[in-house]
Amino acid sequence: MKKANVYINEIEAGTLSELDLGKKYRFEYKGNYRGNPVSLTMPVSQSVYEFNLFPPFFDGLLPEGYQLDGLLKFAKIDRNDLFSQLLAVGDDLVGNVTVKKIER
């Protein structure tokens, strides 16, 4: 299972987990987090969100076109491994969101 911490404005907001190798994902806010939501579709009032596909908000942060091709080649990531793609670019995302891999 892959996991990543998600930060908003450099404050840890929660954890994104891949539960079933590309088939199930979970985002969970930290219990004490009271900042801005990661996405308007995932308000802080609910602490756990589960998805059967890669969460749309995070999917929208991924590179496309030539940038995606370059990332896949450079990092040797499978085109369908969206979680690994997010981890590879997580320090340089558009906006105030940062994603960092949780090392086991």
Tell me the role of every PLM-derived stretch.
Residues 1-104:
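Phosphate/dinucleotide-binding and metal-coordinating scaffold of catalytic cores
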